[in-house]
Amino acid sequence: MMGRSETLQDKLHMFHRAFNHPTGLKYPLPSAIVDSEKALRRTLIQEEYKELMYAISNEEDDEVLKELCDLVYVCVGFAVTYGWAFDTAFNRVHKSNMSKLDEEGNPLYREDGKVAKSNCYQPPKLSDLVG
């Protein structure tokens, strides 16, 4: 029997343990720890975003893909740092995004091509995952 495959969250837990990064920080924490950890996470996300934009502007598809993965990596790492159930949250956000279809199951679009919310839209409930 095959075991379950590792999720993104599992892989980031492995990375955090290997590199002595925090996992599952719970409140209340001293504000200095919270502030420094959030500052680090913000910086990592900004750096990866800039690298992604650079790769896109240079039309380097392999680099775009790498930077997309790096950006997802640091974003999931943020959730792991605070012990948030990223995989559960992602599934709820996906379900919420799928609720943007109208009653007939058709997508709605804004003028710029972005998917619009129908009257069927249900926002995700995530507050139970971050406390």
Task: Tell me the role of every PLM-derived stretch.
Residues 1-68, 72-131:
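Flexible "arm" and connector segments at domain edges
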